[in-house]
Amino acid sequence: MAMGTCAVTASAADGDKYTIGICQLVQHEALDAATQGFKDEVTKELGEDAVTFDEQNAQGDSNTCSTIINSFVSNNVDLILANATTALQACAAATTDIPILGTSVTDYATALEISDWSGTTGRNISGTSDLAPLDQQEDMLVELYPDAKHVAILYCSAEANSKYQATEFEKYLDEDGISYKEFTASDSNDIGSVVQSATEYADVIYIPTDNTMAQNTEAINNIALPAGTPIIAGEEGICKGCGVATLSISYYDIGKKAGEMAYDILVNGADITTMKIETAPNVTKEYN
């Protein structure tokens, strides 16, 4: 079943069949969990026979994201799931008609360059955010390392959502009088030298939710662990790979929530232009 508007008035019980395109930026634990949560929920709500998923992975390349999304648009899929910010931005540029749900996107206003933010995009885009409580993550850092004087904030400069988290996290460090410095890698090739510099500066490293860092936790751990520099992570996948602790959302849960939103759009005819961005219902402390 194809569609050219933002809302559908149909019922899966009437035998309608839907095609959903899924563009995942890259393969790593967090994004994989979000995609799985989405598929599980949509399949549960619609039934296996009522939905076909065209699932594509862009292998971390923005141009590949655009190619994938353009193929979805050409095939006139009923809805697109954009898993990660780069995928969402490619969708936003490709279509104003097909409903787009984002997931694993931290800040939609930043990603879509919306200056007057009210919780909805006002266009054919909604979804779920992976923004964790940054104030509580900073509290965790202080609780675990009360003598820390210098914090390195490590992220990829190409990821706008990571910069947003870093800026917000720094506000809480300022409140506690803790010095900090940003250490940014432009891509995976820079990570080794950047992490080495971070360990030389910091008592503790903080890594926000960041796809490039999530892909390279082994390389990060191989430098930070021998240096004796602990890492507080923004999400559980990074924590498992190189961190000491995190206060993390469940990526499976935000994918599942996006699946609920998809059902509401496809079957109940919900107007995506007025659907608020949803957040994770719970956060969990995890230690490694």
Regions found by a protein language model. Give the residues of each.
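Sec-dependent signal peptide cleavage junction
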Residues: 2-15
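Pocket-lining segment of extracytoplasmic ligand-binding domains
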Residues: 160-229, 235
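Short beta-strand elements in bilobed, periplasmic/extracellular small-molecule ligand-binding domains
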Residues: 44-65, 124, 152, 170-188
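An alpha-beta-alpha
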Residues: 20-22, 38, 126-173, 271, ...
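Flexible loop/turn connectors
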Residues: 237-287
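Beta-alpha junction/loop-to-helix N-cap segments that form part of ligand/metal-binding clefts
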Residues: 55-116, 210-225, 229-234
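Hydrophobic alpha-helical segments within soluble ligand-binding/sensing domains
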Residues: 14, 108-149, 249-270
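Extracytoplasmic "Venus flytrap"
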Residues: 19-45, 54-64, 212
